[in-house]
Each structure stands twice: as C-alpha cells, then as structure tokens.
Amino acid sequence: SFDAAHFLTNYEGKCKNIHGHRWRVVVTIKGELTNGMLVDFGDFKKDIKDLCDYFDHSFIVEKGSLHKKLFDLLNKQFVLRVVEFRTTAENFSKYIFEEMSKKYSVKEVCVYETPNNCARYVCE
C-alpha cells in the first residue's frame, strides 16, 4: 500500500479537489509450478513494494493537468509523480498490471482507494 494525494481532471464531484488515499494494491499472478513454486514470494513482494514506494507520500499528477508555473512551484517543495493517465483507481490498476506484467504472469490487479472501494484490472 501507499499513501498519496491526487485530484481528478474533467470531473465536477468532490474528487476534483486535491485529496489523499491509502491506496492498497493486490496483485494476483498465474502460471505453472516449477518444483512446487510459482515465484519466489520475497522477490514478488519486493517488486510490488518498490512500485508502491515510488508513489508513497507523493502528489500524483496527470501529465499536463497543472499550469506550468504551479507545477514548477509545487515541484520545488513536494514530491510530484507525473503519470500519463487520469489518476483513477481504474487506471492505476491497469498501470500496475502492465508494470508487474513485465516480470510476472499477472492474472489481475485490484487497487483499493478506500477499504471498501476497489477497481480491478483482469487479464483477458
């Protein structure tokens, strides 16, 4: 999991304002067992942790969503993480699926932005 702030562009609800979540990430992998094992869970957990740590305690910003002057001012004092997608749980689940799929055979990724609300990206 990671704690981070974001806001939604092109949205008129309360999430258009900067707010934060404790994002929880669940990655499910699939594959054939080799010697009774799918993967080394130590390596797998480290890779998920590294991905989450990149975003932890940052302000996640969709590329181009902030005026350049504001972006430059914020970037001097805070950790900004710029992503190519709108910062929804749905898009985060797809992004994490794609990143983890570079090394693992991922079946699905669930990203929770609250304890009860999650978005799931599933391999088709």
Indicate residue ranges for each PLM-predicted region.
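Charge-rich, low-complexity N-terminal segments
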Residues: 1-124
